[in-house]
């Protein structure tokens, strides 16, 4: 149990802070308006709710449960790629040749698997990873080893993202403090790339309907 607690704590350290990701940028943007830390953290959590940012380690575990057995892994991953399905736990917006956090978390995954005497998920892990690198040249991110590690430690899959939040609050809070120290309102510019002239054909129809509605109200 002591070893598992240590591994859990180190996984929280790996998740605690990771630059200007979506949730961190959200927290800093909210802070720049001089909203309070409660609003900043709430906004960060809301952005983490999106499956493209948070929840990836949950999806990894759902995938491994679908595969069920190492014997099914090769066929499953090849079918998924043939169907152009998204395989969660792989790829990163910054790391193109591998997430630097993965080797550490992979080591902890192996330790937990040894403690639990369960090698099934490790075998699935290796098969899926091998195919993803060979066929797509896409490497795993930290969510890939974290999902099965948390599962083997006894956490319900639905708790993986809340655990992420518990960890990342540290990083968000640090960014809020840093933003306030030399604050300027964050106001990105947007470049319009729509058509230069647009005819609004439905405007006259809408105005006619509104006019009729007002007439009916007057009659009533």
Report each predicted region and the residues it spans.
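A structural-propensity feature for long, helix-poor, extended segments
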Residues: 72-108, 197-208
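Conserved phosphate/anionic-ligand binding catalytic regions in large, soluble enzymes, centered on
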Residues: 34-61, 87-96, 139-175
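Short, small-residue-biased leader/transition segments that mark boundaries at the very start
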Residues: 1-7
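Short acidic alpha-helical/loop segments enriched in Asp/Glu that coordinate divalent cations
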Residues: 57-62, 73-77, 120
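Short, hydrophobic/aliphatic alpha-helical segments
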Residues: 11, 20-47, 77-78, 126-152
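Acidic, carboxylate-rich catalytic segments that either coordinate divalent cations
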Residues: 84, 115-220
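Cytochrome P450
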Residues: 50, 66-70
